[in-house]
A protein has these predicted regions:
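Gly/Ser/Thr-rich loops at beta-strand to alpha-helix junctions
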Residues: 8-16, 36-39
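Short, small-residue-biased leader/transition segments that mark boundaries at the very start
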Residues: 2-4
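Short Gly/Thr/Asp-enriched flexible loops that form oxyanion-binding sites at enzyme active sites
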Residues: 16-24
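C-terminal substrate-binding/catalytic lobe of Rossmann-fold NAD(P)-dependent dehydrogenases
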Residues: 24-30, 40-185
Length: 187
């Protein structure tokens, strides 16, 4: 790409992305934080293990601030194009016994996975490196991709002037914009 993009990966990533956006003088589309990319990957991994289905069939995301205040918009979680509830019903009719997910426990798993890696290995730099490489590949490619990166909010979901992770279209031109997802009022 002909325009250099900045990726923020240092924690607290959302605050660091916000500060860099404000002080750098660069266009906002050139700045993004790793946000909840890893959290979303951990969510898909946990769902894959629980449902015993390949991760590539799972579309589920972690939104908000990376860390303890992140949340999972369950109304937007899908397995091969159907909601989780529809998936349970469908596989049950096939004779498969799939236990419904404890949503609070899954969120706790997502939030604590990084800490468990640090306790076991001393750091989480490998997973962050993979996320950075995926973003670099997207930016250097000729097509856009959707990721839960941290970038400035401009009225999406009624939120202004803060960097948070939501579905974001990213590509060779950097951050193209947020992809709105319907959520319940509770979410």
């Amino acid at each position: 790409s002909d325009v250099y993009k900045r990726q923020i990966v240092s924690n607290p990533v959302d605050i660091m992305t916000y500060v860099f956006t404000k002080i750098s003088g660069l266009p906002e589309n050139q700045i993004l934080g790793s946000g909840t990319m890893l959290d979303s990957a951990r969510l898909r991994c946990g769902l894959s293990e629980h449902l015993n289905i390949a991760q590539k069939n799972i579309h589920a995301y972690v939104f908000g601030e990376h860390g303890d205040t992140s949340f999972i918009p369950w109304s937007g979680a899908y397995v091969s194009g159907v909601s989780l509830d529809e998936y349970y019903e469908t596989v049950e009719k096939m004779g498969k016994n799939v236990t419904k997910i404890d949503k609070d426990a899954m969120l706790e798993y997502v939030r604590t996975s990084g800490g468990q890696v640090i306790a076991n290995k001393g750091a989480t730099f490998y997973a962050v490196s993979v996320a950075v490489c995926k973003l670099v590949a997207t930016i250097l490619s000729s097509s856009d991709s959707v990721a839960t990166v941290s970038s400035m909010m401009h009225g999406e979901y009624g939120i202004e002037e803060v960097c948070l992770s939501t579905l974001t279209l990213v590509g060779p031109k950097g951050v193209q914009g947020k992809i709105p997802m319907r959520m319940t009022q509770e979410e």
